[in-house]
A protein has these predicted regions:
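Terminal, low-structured helical/coil segments at or just beyond the last alpha-helical repeat
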Residues: 12, 106-127
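Hydrophobic face of amphipathic alpha-helices that form TPR/SEL1-like repeat modules
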Residues: 38-45, 74-81, 113-117
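TPR/TPR-like (Sel1-like) alpha-helical repeat modules
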Residues: 87-105, 112
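Short helix-capping/linker turns of helical repeat alpha-solenoids
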Residues: 29-32, 45-47, 52, 65-68, ...
Length: 127
C-alpha cells in the first residue's frame, strides 16, 4: 500500500475518533454513565483527544457516582496502581470490592490478586 494512502486512512480514523469523542462528551455531560465511561477511557488512552489521566479519573468518578460498576472497578484499579491519582492500595481494593459486590465480573476475578498483593506488601514491610 502506498504511504500516502496509509496517511489518508490514518487521518480518516483520527477525524472519526475525534468526532466520536466530542459526541460522547456531550452525552457524558448530560449525566449518562455509559458515555462517562467512554469519555474516561478516551482520556486515559488519548483517543480522539489529548491523554489526560486526571480527566479520566474525573469521568470515572462521575460514572461511578451514577451507578456504573465498570467505572467503579476502573477507579479501583487506578487507585491501586496510582494511575492518574496518588497510589492508595486500600482505596483501590475498596472500589474493586464495591464493583464485585455489585456483580462486575472482572472485579470478582481481580480482587483476590489485589488482596494477595496487599498481604505480600505487609509481609515485606515486616522484614
Amino acid at each position: 500500500m502506498e504511504p500516502c494512502v496509509l496517511i489518508k486512512i490514518m487521518g480518516f480514523f483520527k477525524n472519526r475518533t475525534a468526532r466520536l469523542f466530542n459526541e460522547s462528551l456531550m452525552k457524558a455531560e448530560q449525566g449518562i454513565p455509559e458515555f462517562q465511561v467512554i469519555v474516561a477511557d478516551m482520556f486515559r488512552e488519548g483517543a480522539g483527544t489529548v491523554s489526560d489521566n486526571q480527566k479520566a479519573i474525573y469521568w470515572y468518578e462521575e460514572a461511578s457516582n451514577n451507578g456504573n460498576t465498570e467505572a467503579t472497578y476502573k477507579l479501583g484499579v487506578a487507585y491501586f496502581r496510582g494511575d492518574g491519582v496518588d497510589e492508595d492500595i486500600d482505596k483501590g481494593i475498596e472500589y474493586v470490592e464495591r464493583a464485585a459486590k455489585d456483580g462486575y465480573k472482572m472485579a470478582t476475578k481481580t480482587l483476590p490478586t489485589m488482596k494477595a498483593f496487599k498481604q505480600h506488601q505487609k509481609l515485606v514491610k515486616k522484614e
